[in-house]
Amino acid sequence: MKIILFLSLLIWVIPGFGKVKIQKPRSQHVTAFAIIVDEMTLEKTGGAVEAYRDALEADGLSTYIVSGNWKNPDEVKAEIIKLNKRKPVLEGVVFIGDIPVALIRNAQHMTTAFKMNEDEFPFPESSVPSDRFYDDLHLTFDFICQDSVNTSHFYYKLREDSPQQLRPTFYSGRIKYPEARGGDKYEAIAKYLAKAVREKKRANLLDCFVSFTGSGYNSECLLAWMDERLALTENFPLAWKNSRTAKFLNFRMEDYMKYRLFDELQRDEMDVMLFHEHGAPDRQYICDGPAPAGLQGYMNYIKSSIYSFVKREIERKKGTPEEIMAYFTKEYALGSDFFKDFSMEKIAEQNSLERLKTGIVLEDLKELKTNPRFVMFDACYNGSFHEDGYIAGYYIFNDGNTVVTQG
């Protein structure tokens, strides 16, 4: 009788929310896990999702598959709350495919670095996409509105009478394909799930890691990283065999460190890659390029910097090009022929080429097979899963071995 109950497919129809289907766990364990997926993704990747479920159950988690044509975050959260009240206790959830995104306002006191005036800047810029809406059931929110352009985005305000500290009820993650990458997203999700199942079956010890620090991070203070070695020694004790299995890299080591990092990312034995850098949804800021050398080198550097400042002021329409050049000439006591080589087009081309060499961008990752099983982005925005293209997504959706990213 118990076997029949566990193999049965339970379908709940909730008034006002539409049809939600719940496949109950196939085995009984101490804790439970939930796969939350949209109907279309499940239809297109059903076999891969079920294989993923089986791998989780083999790992000791009673696993639900919850699917629906989700209309808003509240609908998803209602199902999670119901599961959380069941036995065994819910340990974690994963969101696969097109699950609505909650963007939170009135909660910047709980963000590490993101601070933006919510009254002065538009909602998409000044709101924080966060799955704490789903996994921290202590928090309470007021719904504001649905985004009129990106209809999978919904804005919520953290209530003043809500708890004001993060205390997640369980852990959560997302498997969301970055559609800017192109291709069939359902095929890519199925391929990723197969990779996750494959890696879970491997007997792979964590015995190889690389930690990288980019320019401008922690004020470029080397002393700030002295304790990282102690922490990693305690957490990854098997990795300290030689300089290849426990490696620390710094942006100063080469003029353009991104190419050195590409070599590290493609090593098959890599288990963990730690990035400490500044970031954007579509870029990892790695270095600043080569330092000036000699008198002429510094003169060229100063000239290039001033040209870039002038170009920026012209683009901001702070005056005519002649007025802006006259201001800089007077401010910095420049010679009369200092701007004779000034060209907006030439500066834009030079800056673009330099930017490509000093950062890892989405186009780089599109052709790269990343192999560290886990990649951490200690950086702003690299994990912006609500964007069509985001760095963390490109690391897991390729033919390498990366299965988990944190950003």
Give, region by region, the residue ranges found by the protein language model.
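Bacterial Sec-dependent N-terminal signal peptides
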Residues: M1-V20
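Cysteine-dependent hydrolase recognition
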Residues: K19-G407
